[in-house]
């Protein structure tokens, strides 16, 4: 195991990479389709129909390329989450196992965003071009995206993202406190095993609620929706624990205000 002076910069570098990738993901999934849709979308006359698109190489080739990028991301994200790979990584990288997983996931997502091929001439599932819908629908989508991202960031109040990002493992190791998950209750471990992507509904809103749902966006939304659906397995016990944790943390946040009131 590397000394602490090397562990801390490695964990911080992984976190910074993941944070930057998250900012880029906001631009990729929200800002580009909402604010750049006029310049990037093709005219209705230039678009192919659904049947004609299946025979057009200029549409099929970029779609296959985009599908390959998504499968690369999903494959990396799933393979490195298996117990066999995690045990192997823990054996050779120790407490950096989670940080390495986060860094590899961020790099895979960067590949998807950097090399994604738009399909402006492809068919669209829906589109708003006539007034008043061309004004109000993009505005409504923008508001829903802002709310969704705020909810995603607010989940930091409930979930231990320092552990999910790999920072807490290194911090505890340096202080000699052991494994962070070993200190959590069985109910917390049960919840984390069922839900490692605690932003499912919000991400689905971001993926699907857009003014123009073109072919490549439809591919992105469908595949990530399927992946998110398979990655979740919450039950009533998890929901009760999650509700109790939210109430407890909100109570802790309100304590200073109560003290000032007294």
Swiss-Prot record:
Primary localization: nucleus
Entry keyword annotation includes Zinc-finger: no
Organism name: Bos taurus (Bovine)
Cell location: Nucleus inner membrane
Protein name as it appears in the record: Nurim
Nuclear side: 1-4, 81-97, 165-191, 235-262
Transmembrane regions: 5-28, 59-80, 98-114, 134-164, 192-210, 217-234
Gene coding for it: NRM
Membrane topology: Multi-pass membrane protein
Keywords for the protein's UniProt record, in alphabetical order: Membrane, Nucleus, Transmembrane, Transmembrane helix
Superkingdom, natural source: Eukaryota
